Amino acid sequence: MSKKGLLIVISGPSGAGKGTICKALMKEQQFWLSVSATTREPREKEVEGKSYYFLTVDEFKSKISEDGFLEYAEVYGNYYGTPKKSVCEKIDNGENVILEIDIQGALKVKENYPEGVFIFILPPSMEELKKRIIGRGSETEKSLMTRFKSAYKEINYVSKYNYAIINDTVENAVTKINSIIVAEKCRVDRIKDNIIDSKEGKIHEQFYD
Protein backbone atom coordinates (compact mmCIF):
# COMPACT_ATOMS: atom_id res chain seq x y z
CA MET A 1 0.00 0.00 0.00
CA SER A 2 1.03 3.60 -0.54
CA LYS A 3 3.16 5.14 2.22
CA LYS A 4 1.88 8.60 1.41
CA GLY A 5 -1.44 9.79 2.71
CA LEU A 6 -4.38 10.78 0.57
CA LEU A 7 -6.18 14.06 0.05
CA ILE A 8 -9.86 13.15 0.22
CA VAL A 9 -12.01 15.97 -1.14
CA ILE A 10 -15.69 15.72 -0.23
CA SER A 11 -18.38 17.97 -1.65
CA GLY A 12 -21.95 17.96 -2.92
CA PRO A 13 -25.12 20.02 -2.79
CA SER A 14 -26.38 21.66 0.39
CA GLY A 15 -28.37 19.14 2.42
CA ALA A 16 -26.61 16.06 1.02
CA GLY A 17 -25.00 15.37 4.40
CA LYS A 18 -21.33 16.17 3.72
CA GLY A 19 -20.63 17.57 7.18
CA THR A 20 -22.25 14.66 9.00
CA ILE A 21 -20.29 12.16 6.92
CA CYS A 22 -16.99 13.96 7.55
CA LYS A 23 -17.62 13.98 11.32
CA ALA A 24 -18.35 10.25 11.24
CA LEU A 25 -15.16 9.59 9.25
CA MET A 26 -13.13 11.59 11.76
CA LYS A 27 -14.45 9.40 14.59
CA GLU A 28 -13.73 6.13 12.79
CA GLN A 29 -10.23 6.72 11.45
CA GLN A 30 -7.17 8.87 12.00
CA PHE A 31 -7.78 11.71 9.58
CA TRP A 32 -6.52 15.27 9.60
CA LEU A 33 -9.23 17.79 8.78
CA SER A 34 -7.89 20.53 6.53
CA VAL A 35 -8.07 23.97 8.15
CA SER A 36 -8.83 26.93 5.90
CA ALA A 37 -7.22 30.37 6.01
CA THR A 38 -9.33 33.52 6.06
CA THR A 39 -9.01 37.28 6.30
CA ARG A 40 -12.24 37.75 8.24
CA GLU A 41 -12.20 38.61 11.93
CA PRO A 42 -12.27 35.68 14.40
CA ARG A 43 -15.65 34.99 15.96
CA GLU A 44 -16.21 34.16 19.60
CA LYS A 45 -14.72 30.78 20.60
CA GLU A 46 -12.91 30.34 17.28
CA VAL A 47 -9.34 29.10 17.76
CA GLU A 48 -6.35 30.02 15.59
CA GLY A 49 -5.08 26.98 13.69
CA LYS A 50 -8.13 24.90 14.59
CA SER A 51 -11.14 26.89 13.39
CA TYR A 52 -9.16 28.86 10.79
CA TYR A 53 -5.76 30.35 10.14
CA PHE A 54 -6.52 34.04 10.53
CA LEU A 55 -4.47 36.23 8.15
CA THR A 56 -4.38 39.88 7.22
CA VAL A 57 -5.31 40.77 3.65
CA ASP A 58 -1.64 41.50 2.90
CA GLU A 59 -0.56 38.13 4.33
CA PHE A 60 -3.22 36.34 2.29
CA LYS A 61 -2.27 38.12 -0.94
CA SER A 62 1.38 37.34 -0.28
CA LYS A 63 0.54 33.63 -0.05
CA ILE A 64 -1.42 33.88 -3.30
CA SER A 65 1.65 35.33 -5.05
CA GLU A 66 3.75 32.48 -3.60
CA ASP A 67 1.28 29.85 -4.93
CA GLY A 68 0.52 28.97 -1.33
CA PHE A 69 -3.10 27.83 -1.77
CA LEU A 70 -4.68 24.77 -3.33
CA GLU A 71 -7.69 27.02 -3.92
CA TYR A 72 -8.97 30.37 -2.73
CA ALA A 73 -11.91 32.68 -3.25
CA GLU A 74 -13.22 36.04 -2.14
CA VAL A 75 -16.62 35.82 -0.42
CA TYR A 76 -18.49 38.91 0.77
CA GLY A 77 -15.29 40.94 0.96
CA ASN A 78 -13.23 38.32 2.81
CA TYR A 79 -10.71 35.84 1.42
CA TYR A 80 -10.87 32.11 2.15
CA GLY A 81 -8.38 29.50 1.00
CA THR A 82 -6.91 26.03 1.53
CA PRO A 83 -3.22 26.31 2.51
CA LYS A 84 -1.07 24.07 0.34
CA LYS A 85 1.90 23.62 2.71
CA SER A 86 0.04 22.18 5.71
CA VAL A 87 -1.98 19.78 3.55
CA CYS A 88 1.05 18.51 1.59
CA GLU A 89 3.15 18.07 4.75
CA LYS A 90 0.48 15.85 6.31
CA ILE A 91 0.15 13.78 3.13
CA ASP A 92 3.94 13.35 2.84
CA ASN A 93 3.96 12.13 6.46
CA GLY A 94 1.48 9.40 5.59
CA GLU A 95 -1.64 11.04 6.99
CA ASN A 96 -4.98 11.11 5.20
CA VAL A 97 -6.41 14.62 4.88
CA ILE A 98 -10.13 15.35 4.57
CA LEU A 99 -11.18 18.52 2.81
CA GLU A 100 -14.89 19.35 2.93
CA ILE A 101 -15.42 22.10 0.41
CA ASP A 102 -17.92 23.60 -2.03
CA ILE A 103 -18.00 22.34 -5.61
CA GLN A 104 -16.22 25.30 -7.21
CA GLY A 105 -13.44 25.03 -4.62
CA ALA A 106 -13.13 21.28 -5.20
CA LEU A 107 -12.68 21.78 -8.93
CA LYS A 108 -9.93 24.33 -8.26
CA VAL A 109 -8.20 21.84 -5.94
CA LYS A 110 -8.44 19.21 -8.70
CA GLU A 111 -6.59 21.55 -11.07
CA ASN A 112 -3.77 22.03 -8.56
CA TYR A 113 -3.73 18.55 -6.98
CA PRO A 114 -5.20 16.04 -9.49
CA GLU A 115 -3.93 13.05 -7.50
CA GLY A 116 -6.52 13.78 -4.81
CA VAL A 117 -9.57 11.55 -4.34
CA PHE A 118 -12.67 13.53 -5.24
CA ILE A 119 -15.95 12.23 -3.80
CA PHE A 120 -19.37 13.70 -4.57
CA ILE A 121 -22.11 13.15 -1.98
CA LEU A 122 -25.62 12.73 -3.38
CA PRO A 123 -28.97 12.60 -1.57
CA PRO A 124 -31.11 9.47 -2.12
CA SER A 125 -33.55 11.66 -4.06
CA MET A 126 -34.36 15.33 -4.62
CA GLU A 127 -37.46 14.84 -2.47
CA GLU A 128 -35.26 13.64 0.40
CA LEU A 129 -32.93 16.59 -0.13
CA LYS A 130 -35.92 18.91 0.14
CA LYS A 131 -37.00 17.25 3.42
CA ARG A 132 -33.51 17.59 4.89
CA ILE A 133 -33.23 21.28 4.06
CA ILE A 134 -36.74 22.02 5.35
CA GLY A 135 -35.94 19.98 8.47
CA ARG A 136 -33.22 22.44 9.42
CA GLY A 137 -35.96 24.98 10.10
CA SER A 138 -33.69 27.87 9.22
CA GLU A 139 -34.82 28.63 5.69
CA THR A 140 -37.44 31.03 4.35
CA GLU A 141 -39.59 29.98 1.40
CA LYS A 142 -37.49 32.17 -0.87
CA SER A 143 -34.16 30.80 0.37
CA LEU A 144 -35.50 27.24 0.05
CA MET A 145 -36.21 27.79 -3.63
CA THR A 146 -32.73 29.27 -4.09
CA ARG A 147 -31.13 26.24 -2.44
CA PHE A 148 -33.16 23.76 -4.51
CA LYS A 149 -32.26 25.49 -7.77
CA SER A 150 -28.61 25.58 -6.72
CA ALA A 151 -28.70 21.86 -5.80
CA TYR A 152 -30.09 20.89 -9.21
CA LYS A 153 -27.27 22.81 -10.91
CA GLU A 154 -24.58 21.43 -8.61
CA ILE A 155 -25.55 17.79 -9.21
CA ASN A 156 -24.59 18.28 -12.86
CA TYR A 157 -20.95 18.52 -11.71
CA VAL A 158 -20.88 14.92 -10.46
CA SER A 159 -19.07 13.77 -13.64
CA LYS A 160 -16.06 15.90 -12.63
CA TYR A 161 -15.47 13.67 -9.59
CA ASN A 162 -13.82 10.27 -9.18
CA TYR A 163 -16.61 8.77 -7.09
CA ALA A 164 -20.26 9.40 -6.25
CA ILE A 165 -21.77 8.22 -2.96
CA ILE A 166 -25.52 8.16 -2.35
CA ASN A 167 -26.04 9.15 1.28
CA ASP A 168 -29.02 6.94 2.14
CA THR A 169 -27.57 6.40 5.62
CA VAL A 170 -24.42 7.87 7.15
CA GLU A 171 -23.18 4.38 8.06
CA ASN A 172 -23.43 3.12 4.47
CA ALA A 173 -21.78 6.25 3.09
CA VAL A 174 -18.87 6.00 5.55
CA THR A 175 -18.37 2.29 4.77
CA LYS A 176 -18.17 3.05 1.04
CA ILE A 177 -15.73 5.92 1.54
CA ASN A 178 -13.49 3.75 3.73
CA SER A 179 -13.50 1.11 0.95
CA ILE A 180 -12.54 3.78 -1.60
CA ILE A 181 -9.61 4.86 0.58
CA VAL A 182 -8.28 1.28 0.88
CA ALA A 183 -8.60 0.76 -2.90
CA GLU A 184 -6.92 4.09 -3.71
CA LYS A 185 -3.94 3.23 -1.50
CA CYS A 186 -3.48 0.01 -3.50
CA ARG A 187 -3.50 1.66 -6.92
CA VAL A 188 -0.40 0.79 -8.92
CA ASP A 189 0.29 4.39 -9.90
CA ARG A 190 0.48 5.26 -6.18
CA ILE A 191 2.67 2.35 -5.07
CA LYS A 192 4.77 1.38 -8.12
CA ASP A 193 7.88 3.21 -6.85
CA ASN A 194 7.67 1.36 -3.52
CA ILE A 195 7.31 -1.98 -5.34
CA ILE A 196 10.22 -1.32 -7.71
CA ASP A 197 12.51 -0.08 -4.92
CA SER A 198 11.64 -3.14 -2.83
CA LYS A 199 12.27 -5.56 -5.72
CA GLU A 200 15.59 -3.98 -6.64
CA GLY A 201 16.68 -4.08 -3.02
CA LYS A 202 15.92 -7.81 -2.73
CA ILE A 203 17.70 -8.60 -6.03
CA HIS A 204 20.73 -6.63 -4.84
CA GLU A 205 20.82 -8.62 -1.60
CA GLN A 206 20.60 -11.97 -3.43
CA PHE A 207 23.48 -11.18 -5.80
CA TYR A 208 25.86 -9.21 -3.61
CA ASP A 209 25.30 -10.28 0.00
UniProtKB/Swiss-Prot annotation:
GO cellular component terms, A-Z: cytosol
Pfam families recorded: Guanylate_kin
Keyword field contains Nucleotide-binding: yes
Reaction equations catalysed: GMP + ATP = GDP + ADP
Alphabetized UniProt keyword annotations: ATP-binding, Cytoplasm, Kinase, Nucleotide-binding, Transferase
UniProt EC number: 2.7.4.8
Keyword Transferase: yes
Compartments, record wording: Cytoplasm
Cysteines engaged in disulfide bonds, as pairs: none
Signal peptide interval: none
Ranges for domain Guanylate kinase-like: 5-182
InterPro entries per UniProt: GK/Ca_channel_bsu, Guanylate_kin-like_dom, Guanylate_kinase, Guanylate_kinase_CS, P-loop_NTPase
Top-rank EC class of the record's enzyme: transferase
GO terms assigned for molecular function: ATP binding; guanylate kinase activity
Binding site for ATP: G12, P13, S14, G15, A16, G17, K18, G19
Biological function: Essential for recycling GMP and indirectly, cGMP.
Protein family (similarity comment): Belongs to the guanylate kinase family.
Record-given protein name: Guanylate kinase
Annotated organism of origin: Clostridium acetobutylicum (strain ATCC 824 / DSM 792 / JCM 1419 / IAM 19013 / LMG 5710 / NBRC 13948 / NRRL B-527 / VKM B-1787 / 2291 / W)
Phylogenetic classification of the source organism: Bacteria, Bacillati, Bacillota, Clostridia, Eubacteriales
